[in-house]
């Protein structure tokens, strides 16, 4: 069983209160809140490897592509997919 308070600690925005109550966010179809590890990874990418994926021949583009494909492999393992070709990244749940 998950300790919901430990899970909430991973999401900085959920430390806020609204009208004196802990913030609860249910509009996940529009966007999802990100845990700190995701925010840290995004910050690192924007600071050090921000380039087009699969569209450039320069060093930074290759680095970005390698990281993108490594993320695809991580997701594949997490959901036990047979192949990375089964993993499709989109901008949102309704795309």
Annotated model-derived regions:
Residues 1-95:
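Pyridoxal 5′-phosphate
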């Amino acid at each position: 069983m998950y300790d919901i308070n430990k899970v909430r600690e991973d999401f900085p925005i959920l430390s806020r209160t609204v009208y004196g109550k802990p913030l609860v966010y249910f509009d996940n179809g529009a966007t999802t809140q990100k845990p700190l590890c995701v925010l840290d990874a995004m910050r690192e990418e924007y600071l050090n490897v921000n380039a087009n994926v699969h569209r450039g021949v320069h060093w930074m583009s290759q680095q970005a592509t390698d990281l993108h494909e490594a993320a695809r492999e991580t997701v594949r393992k997490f959901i036990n997919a047979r192949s990375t070709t089964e993993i499709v990244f989109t901008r949102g749940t309704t795309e």
